[in-house]
Design a protein with these regions (language model features):
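Conserved, mostly hydrophobic/aromatic
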Residues: 20, 44, 74, 113, ...
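Conserved glycine-rich "GG(E/T)P / GGGxP" loop and the immediately following alpha-helix
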Residues: 111-136, 153-157, 226-230
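Conserved C-terminal portion of the radical SAM core fold
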Residues: 137, 170-181, 200-243
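N-terminal pre-triad scaffold of radical SAM enzymes
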Residues: 39-83, 88-114
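Conserved radical SAM core fold
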Residues: 83, 112, 117-120, 147-154, ...
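Flexible, acidic/Gly-rich N-terminal and inter-domain linker regions that tether
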Residues: 1-63, 67-71
Length: 243
């Protein structure tokens, strides 16, 4: 090995990476705690090159936020507001299509659609939004609705989650974003977003989407109340879902 780690605790992890062995939660904690940033970068690049060669990919997307009105009040959220807030808004479908028309002038390849859980907008609003965008921009991929939104839309539609996902997919949904995962640890979620669905439900929504051929992203909100161990646990749970 030509690279020399400043932190000798990374040497056992390097051996695992070299022999394609799976890292443990404890390894994840070590990687979070080490000050050897170049060492972590070296390890990550070994895996990146093995999986993707020397290729890097980007997409050109545009965010569409139909509304910022939300029934929840998550402690960390600066987006969602109540209906009587002076900055509250809800866009008509015509406004959304008009916005998309402006965006698409720049060779956009994806519309990323997320918003608040509006107390009054019907399921048909979201369905017609997907259909309208797909008719107008058939070449643009639509990634829309976090797991929290999808669970809420299923309630609006009065359908099981699988049927809701299929209905949305038929209307033009291509994949789902990873928002709302925050940190899966119950201790933390109870304090920062107790009204949201629990981590296990977030994972089950994504599992259902994968079962229907929909791909998804995943996020992690960190740097607040969580421990390093809870960060590592979050990543392990995502990896288990990916399995």
């Amino acid at each position: 090995m030509l690279f020399e780690f400043e932190d000798e605790n990374l040497n056992p992890i390097y051996e695992k990476v070299r022999f394609h062995e799976r890292l443990s939660l404890e390894d994840g904690v070590t990687l979070w705690k080490t000050q050897d940033l170049l060492g972590v970068g070296y390890l990550a690049n070994q895996v990146r090159e093995r999986m993707n060669g020397d290729k890097t990919y980007f997409i050109h997307n545009r965010h569409i936020n139909p509304t910022n009105i939300c029934i929840h009040s998550c402690q960390f959220c600066a987006f969602g507001v109540k209906e009587d807030h002076p900055h509250a808004y809800e866009k008509s479908l015509d406004e959304i299509f008009s916005d998309a028309e402006k965006y698409n002038g720049g060779d956009v390849s994806e519309f990323h659609i997320v918003g608040g859980l509006h107390p009054d907008l019907p399921f048909e609003y979201y369905l017609d939004m997907l259909k309208g965008l797909k008719v107008r921009f058939p070449e643009v991929h639509i990634q829309a609705f976090t797991a929290i939104e999808l669970e809420y839309l299923a309630k609006l539609a009065k359908l099981p989650l699988d049927e809701t996902l299929l209905t949305l997919k038929d209307a033009g949904l291509g994949s789902i974003p990873g928002g709302g995962a925050e940190i899966f640890a119950k201790r933390v979620r109870k304090k920062i977003c107790g009204e949201k669905l629990i981590g296990e439900h977030w994972l089950s929504v994504h599992e259902a989407a994968h079962g229907l051929g929909l791909k998804s992203n995943a996020t992690m909100l960190y740097g607040h109340l969580e421990t390093v161990e809870e960060r590592a646990d979050h990543l392990v749970r995502l990896r288990e879902l990916q399995d």
